[in-house]
Amino acid sequence: ASHCERHEHYTGILADDLGLIFLSMLDLQNGSKHVRNCFLLFGLKIHIGVRGGGKDGKDSESKTFAMLIPKLQDRKHLPQPESYDLDDETFVPFCTKFKYLGSTITCDLDDTTEIERRLSLAHMTFNKFRKLLCNQRIRVDLRGQLYQMCVLSVLLAGCETWAVKHSHLTLLTSFHNRCTRAMCGLNLWHCWMHKISTENILQERLKMLPLDIIFYQRQLRFLHRVACMDPSRLTFQALSSQAARLPGMKMAAGKKVNTLSTWKNTLEKSGLSSEKSGGKLEEWIPNIRGPNCTTIVEEKLGLPPGSFKFKPRPIHPHTGF
């Protein structure tokens, strides 16, 4: 006991959902065998399919799936395989989309499927609370709080890491405006006949913000939380590894949309990053942790003074931000 040392391993708390990345099919097959053998040492078992292990001699279902993510130029031509074998009896099937930790991941790495699913869930949630949200006898501020807590929370769950296109924001904004009109007892015909603008409904009647501003706020809070992490944290390293655009990098026809470009657009809209910097850490991290950050964001996004705040966090002693 005198030779023992204490090690804090907080990431070892999670032992349920596991996602692994392999760079080739051979690595996937060999790595799956190593993971299965390692789990057996701890008395754990991976739920994989068994040949002929189901009813009527059919293959049993597998709770473990694999997904092939081909290169961008090969995604239209390369077919998805059905499964791969671990041994003579067990196999792991492939899938084109998979729900992992509440988010839907597709083989083309496009967030359209996840955003459409969020819109469907938010629509169902709004219909459940419609009698309360559209009840004119209830105070407007209470209905607005209920809408933000129940409907918007479902709609924008996980939006901090979305790769958002302009068409995605249009769909989200359209749903938000349709719900707010219903809360005021209006439709498009009323707005057209009486010249009622969306700004009038959101700001004057319901005291709400446009959905794109709410989206930017959520992403900024996430980026601020990551910027205040210890640089040794995996989340900080993952963000910093893709935050800077390579010098001389040329974009393909049409602007490529990914998580980096979405974060960069949010930082530019908020005045925390210039358009030429590519979102480099040395620029936007000191800005988002600076004392005037909230003032800059409020001015750029048109928010009322004092309405946007970050949770205060101490300056890191080694990095200085």
Per-region residue spans from a language model:
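Short linear motifs embedded in intrinsically disordered, charge-biased segments
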Residues: 1-321
